[in-house]
Amino acid sequence: SLVGSEMCIRDSLKPLGTTQQHLMDWDVEVNGGKIVLETVDYHGNTVHLCNQYSDVEKIEITCCGRVNVIDTNGIVGAHDNHIPLPMFKNATALSLPGPRLRQLGKDMSKFMRAGHGGEINALHELSARVSAAIKYSKGKTDTSTTAEMSMEIGMGVCQDHVHAFITVARCLDYSARYVSGYLLMCDGETQDAS
């Protein structure tokens, strides 16, 4: 719920349909306002613009639906959006490699040259090494924490693992980008995830 006199809200609450993720049904409801525009962003995500009714103090946006997901161990297939893949080789403020991440990149280069099962296996190994280096711990980092800072303190959450992973993947000359969404936990709870 949000409080205010009048506002326009941008939301991305509809899952992207892919070969691994099929939307069976999905509904976005706006109480205290209405969806005035549904469009698609440059990644192919559905985006809504919602206006709050001027005579209400609160707007509540909820979504509900069913998604059939096929587990492909993180392999999504061919690139299918309009942004050229080399764009995802560029570092961001949160994914600049420092000494720890550069060292992990060197270690992974050695792993790959030793022929341990190809690129996909190497990227799964990178994921495992990042998880080992950054122990999952809430409250130790925030949205401004860089990948190198997470490696330095050795703790973080999903976003920190992702930033470290994409930083090293880019050092290895792979195109990699941050993707966020929602994660359904085993106990039925949902949380933001990356």
Describe the residue ranges of each PLM region:
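Secondary-structure boundary elements
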Residues: T62, V67-D71, V76-G77, H82-G156, ...
